[in-house]
Regions:
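Charged, low-complexity intrinsically disordered segments
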Residues: 1-152
C-alpha cells in the first residue's frame, strides 16, 4: 500500500513553508520559506526586506496579500516556489535527510484553510507544494547518487 503524508505538522512539520528555518534566496536571508515566497511577489528590495523582517511566517503571508504583485507573478510563481524550497533543503542537510527519509511517500499539503492551489482541502486541490517537495526529493536523491558514483 502506498504511503501518504497528508499533513505537514508534527513529525513532518519541516515540510511546511511555515517551518522556521532560515533560507537565503537572491541574497537575502529569510526566517522561513514562507517569508521568501511572499517577498518574491515583488521586485522592490525594500519591500522584500520588510517582508523578511516579519515576526512570523503568518505575518509574512499577510503582508504578501497586501503588496502589488510583480507583473509576471502568475507565470513565475511555481518556479520560484521550486527554487526557494530547493534552497531550503540544500542549505539544511538535516532537513534534506528528513525529506529523503520520506522515501516514496506521496506528499500532500493537506489543509483546512481552503488552499487548493498549493495543497488539498477536503479532497480538492492541485497540491503544488506537495508536488514541488517530491520534485526536490527526487533531485536530492539524484545528487546523492551522483556523489556516491563520483566517490566510489
Amino acid at each position: 500500500m502506498e504511503k501518504v503524508i497528508d499533513c505537514f505538522d508534527g513529525e513532518y512539520a519541516f515540510l511546511s513553508n511555515f517551518y522556521e528555518r532560515p533560507v537565503e534566496w537572491e541574497g537575502i536571508v529569510y526566517p522561513s520559506t514562507e517569508h521568501a515566497f511572499q517577498a518574491a511577489k515583488v521586485i522592490n528590495p525594500a519591500t522584500r526586506l520588510r517582508i523578511a523582517a516579519a515576526e512570523t511566517p503568518g505575518q509574512a503571508k499577510r503582508m504578501g496579500r497586501t503588496v502589488q504583485l510583480r507583473g509576471d507573478w502568475e507565470q513565475v510563481k511555481f518556479n520560484i516556489m521550486l527554487d526557494i524550497v530547493l534552497a531550503k533543503f540544500h542549505q539544511h542537510k538535516d532537513l534534506a535527510e528528513a525529506l529523503l527519509n520520506t522515501g516514496d511517500a506521496t506528499l500532500i499539503e493537506g489543509n483546512t484553510w481552503h488552499d487548493t492551489t498549493w495543497g488539498v482541502c477536503n479532497g480538492v486541490g492541485t497540491n503544488w507544494l506537495g508536488k514541488i517537495l517530491m520534485i526536490v526529493r527526487a533531485q536530492l536523491e539524484l545528487e546523492a547518487q551522483l556523489e556516491n558514483d563520483i566517490n566510489s
